[in-house]
């Protein structure tokens, strides 16, 4: 489809892609870039299954060499949306201060408070949080574009949101980013790797927080947005 082609060409950075360039490593990086852009697993699967169909057709026409299990390492199935919203009881637990104990680390506390900030910013996705720029903040208003859709959004910060933002904002004067999540130039492979590592660590810390709080559902970076959408409407 046209959307699949556009996604591939955007990732490739050119208007050409040869079949011999499609390797398990290339596919894994393509899958990762789609997730970094905010695509759901089902969207990722749609793109990869479309590409696989084109590849298989090319093999049949002897336009491409057959590579066994080429798509084995990437996701080509379908899954139900598991981004469950927290109920009010669990959200109260998340907003409550974690009691001091040996089980709580600074990383867990930071993840909990960033999660609260994302919720207060109308369910801001982690990918948008990571790529926010200092220039996006003017006074108590953040204006930015969703990386997934390109849609422009503005959010007015509450007192609590401003407190958390000022607590965790980037102190490095030379950095254009509002938060110290990324350090490399936007769009570079290194920035993508930094984002992936930060997201993985954020979700790991949130999972620990969720277990410590005894939440009924798994706490993850998606939960803030899904919960905000549920409570807002």
Feature locations, PLM:
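Short, contiguous acidic/charged loop-to-helix segments that flank catalytic cores in large enzymes
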Residues: 101-105, 143-156, 189-198, 216-223
């Amino acid at each position: 489809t046209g959307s699949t082609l556009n996604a591939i060409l955007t990732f490739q950075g050119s208007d050409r892609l040869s079949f011999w360039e499609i390797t398990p490593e290339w596919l894994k990086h393509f899958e990762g870039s789609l997730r970094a852009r905010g695509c759901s697993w089902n969207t990722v699967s749609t793109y990869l299954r479309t590409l696989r169909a084109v590849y298989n057709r090319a093999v049949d026409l002897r336009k491409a060499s057959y590579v066994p299990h080429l798509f084995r390492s990437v996701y080509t199935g379908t899954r139900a949306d598991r981004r469950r919203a927290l109920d009010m009881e669990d959200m109260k637990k998340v907003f409550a201060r974690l009691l001091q104990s040996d089980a709580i680390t600074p990383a867990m506390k930071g993840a909990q408070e960033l999660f609260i900030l994302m919720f207060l910013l109308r369910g801001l996705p982690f990918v948008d949080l990571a790529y926010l720029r200092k220039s996006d903040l003017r006074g108590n208003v953040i204006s930015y574009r969703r990386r997934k859709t390109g849609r422009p959004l503005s959010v007015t910060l509450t007192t609590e949101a401003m407190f958390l933002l000022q607590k965790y904002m980037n102190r490095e004067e030379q950095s254009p980013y509002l938060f110290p999540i990324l350090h490399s130039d936007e769009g570079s492979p290194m920035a993508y790797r930094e984002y992936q590592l930060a997201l993985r660590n954020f979700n790991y810390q949130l999972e620990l927080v969720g277990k410590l709080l005894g939440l009924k559902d798994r706490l993850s970076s998606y939960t803030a947005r899904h919960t905000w959408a549920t409570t807002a409407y």
